[in-house]
């Protein structure tokens, strides 16, 4: 059976080397996130200040995989 994951939304607060990011979740927890392969292949840029969806394992809640970059509400796109 495939492992179940939690999906949270959060804000990128800091960009770290090797595609890692420090993310503040909506419940104020700070976790370490990395970019998923689909986002990396699609050349989607993730910068500090972006809101993202992150998938967190139930076994290690301090690390997660960024699966979606949310559109900013104040952008003109």
Curated annotation (Swiss-Prot):
Molecular function in Gene Ontology: ribosome binding; rRNA binding; translation initiation factor activity
Pfam families linked to this entry: eIF-1a
Domain S1-like as annotated: residue spans: 1-71
Subcellular location: Plastid, Chloroplast
InterPro entries: NA-bd_OB-fold (IPR012340), RNA-binding_domain_S1_IF1 (IPR006196), S1_domain (IPR003029), TIF_IF1 (IPR004368)
Gene3D superfamilies named among the record's database cross-references: Nucleic acid-binding proteins
Keywords: Chloroplast, Initiation factor, Plastid, Protein biosynthesis, RNA-binding, rRNA-binding
SUPFAM superfamilies found in the cross-reference section: Nucleic acid-binding proteins (SSF50249)
GO cellular-component term (any): chloroplast
Cross-referenced CDD domains: S1_IF1
Subunit structure: Component of the 30S ribosomal translation pre-initiation complex which assembles on the 30S ribosome in the order IF-2 and IF-3, IF-1 and N-formylmethionyl-tRNA(fMet); mRNA recruitment can occur at any time during PIC assembly.
NCBIfam families in the cross-refs: infA
Function: One of the essential components for the initiation of protein synthesis. Stabilizes the binding of IF-2 and IF-3 on the 30S subunit to which N-formylmethionyl-tRNA(fMet) subsequently binds. Helps modulate mRNA selection, yielding the 30S pre-initiation complex (PIC). Upon addition of the 50S ribosomal subunit IF-1, IF-2 and IF-3 are released leaving the mature 70S translation initiation complex.
Family: Belongs to the IF-1 family.
Protein name (Swiss-Prot/TrEMBL): Translation initiation factor IF-1, chloroplastic
Source organism per UniProt: Daucus carota (Wild carrot)
């Amino acid at each position: 059976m495939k492992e179940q994951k939690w999906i949270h939304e959060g804000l990128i607060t800091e960009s770290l080397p090797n595609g890692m990011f420090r993310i503040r979740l909506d419940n104020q927890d700070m976790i370490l996130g990395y970019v998923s392969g689909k986002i990396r292949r699609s050349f989607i840029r993730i910068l500090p200040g972006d809101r993202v969806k992150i998938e967190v394992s139930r076994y290690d809640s301090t690390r997660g995989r960024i699966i979606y970059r949310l559109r900013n509400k104040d952008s003109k796109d």
